[in-house]
Amino acid sequence: MSTPSPADRHERAEQALGTAGVAYRPVGSAEAVTANSAWWDADADAYHATHGEFLGEADFVWCPEGLREADARLLGDVAGADVLEVGCGSAPCARWLTAQGARTVALDLSAGMLRHAREGNTRTGLYPALLRAGAEQLPLRDDSFDLACSAFGAVPFVASVDAVFAEVARVLRPGGRWVFAVTHPLRWIFPDDPGPNGLTATQPYFDRTPYVEVDEDGAATYVEYHRTVGDFVRALAAAGFRLVDLVEPEWPAGHTRTWGQWSPLRGKLFPGTAIFSAVLDP
């Protein structure tokens, strides 16, 4: 990921955290947790002011392309199921799942995001259980859930995707499904710009060095990790999952909304989202 375009700078969060520049360097789990927790706390209000209407109060939107679970049915029938959402943000997906009859637990690292989640629960009268926790160590019992999902939640922001997948496998029952959406790995090679400048490859696809925003002392204020498609497939297999589908949502006709690097211009040329659907083999 190259430096975000000026129109996509999260100015309030950057000012609060003292973000001064961008680096590509290794970042371990502890530093990433500290940076990203603080980042999403600082950005929570601005994020919801910008994207809250699009995401809805109790809707399950998988991605900026606007694919909804009500249409995609990637999770199947959730009525009566125990469902875990990893990286829930303000939890509109968890509230949608609850409205469909699921027993839902939603977790996030950010207290700021969970504040919005609690407020959303109160407004809608839908109350999925909310839990502040990281994805690399889930404070949940073994074999507790039938399904786990994440719509651009924790997966891009963790140092060890292997740890996340192993933890999800631990808390799922045999035969459970794990479905998660991430920025399509192909996007890593292009500048993070929704316009014409975002159409020329500048970053090597196989360079997995994390994208890091830093303060004046070089401490991380935001961290995002890149994995190739093959990296995700191998990590799923290592955790005991069998990949059953890989969805690359196409940009819908008439969809004019730009979200960061996602735009009609780029969306008609190459995918912006990858949704992995996997089953935990008994």
Q: Model regions: which residues?
A:
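Conserved class I S-adenosyl-L-methionine
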Residues: S2-A79, P92-C93, M113, R177-V212
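A short acidic, Gly/Pro-enriched loop at the edge of an enzyme's catalytic core
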Residues: E136-L147
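Class I SAM-dependent methyltransferase SAM/SAH-binding core
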Residues: D82-Q137
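A short SAM/SAH-binding and catalytic strip from SAM-dependent methyltransferases
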Residues: D146-V161
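Short alpha-helix
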Residues: V212, V223-L246
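A short glycine-rich, Lys/Arg-flanked "PGG" loop and its adjoining helix->strand segment in the class I
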Residues: D162-R177
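Acceptor-substrate binding/catalytic loop of class I
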Residues: V182-F190, E216-D231
